[in-house]
Amino acid sequence: MSVGVLRKLRVQSLRKETTEGLVVALEIPQAFRKSFGFKHGQFLTLEKKINSEIVRRPYSICSQAVSEPSSLEIGIKKVPGGLFSSWAHQELSVGDELDVLPP
């Protein structure tokens, strides 16, 4: 697996922690688990086409560090005027797929 390759990951769950904080759990398919192993402090880069624009944003991983995770959680803070964060808070649903770069 190449570390720099976007992978489609399914949204497993969404949890509102605060009015501005959203925790997104992403399911990691077995074939990609080694490439999504991480150390504390690393992040995932998410890519999404929003309003005809390809948007890439890094989000910190807030899961327990493991070498071959079956899922990962990231935190997305809603930023006023933020294209990706606003979309995630308003449109993202369980079952959606996101393009994600490994840590």
Question: What residues fall within each predicted segment?
Answer:
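Ferredoxin-reductase
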Residues: 2-97, 101
